[in-house]
Amino acid sequence: MIEFLMAAGAPKPVAPFSHATACEGWLFVTGQMPTDPADDSAPLPDGIEAQTRRVLDNLKRVLAGIGSALDRVVFARVYLTHFERDYAAMNRVYESYFAPGHLPARTCIGVTGLARGALVEIDLLARRAQD
């Protein structure tokens, strides 16, 4: 059975999608942007470090709201609009959110643009906490 999940406290979706879908213990988490969960119309944070922190904090909110956490993430996909410029700085922030030696598999993709002019977006594949 497939479940369509919304997480309280996470940024509201700005298009027709769920925060995540669940199937047989797997969680497919929609890409999060650096939007303010309290005010999705607020300006985005300045710089890749602040935007990466906001994205990962938003992902933590989504995961907590659907019964998981960052330590249950098995795969991440990162989208960067300025790959060469922002890759190293994004990695420093990204790595700080995971326990040493427990980094999920990951793909990082350079893209020509993201909604609202964001610099970064990240989606995840995770397991539910009870698995």
Where are these regions (language model features)?
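N-terminal presequence-like segments and the immediate start of the first folded domain
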Residues: M1-D57, R61-V74, L80-D131
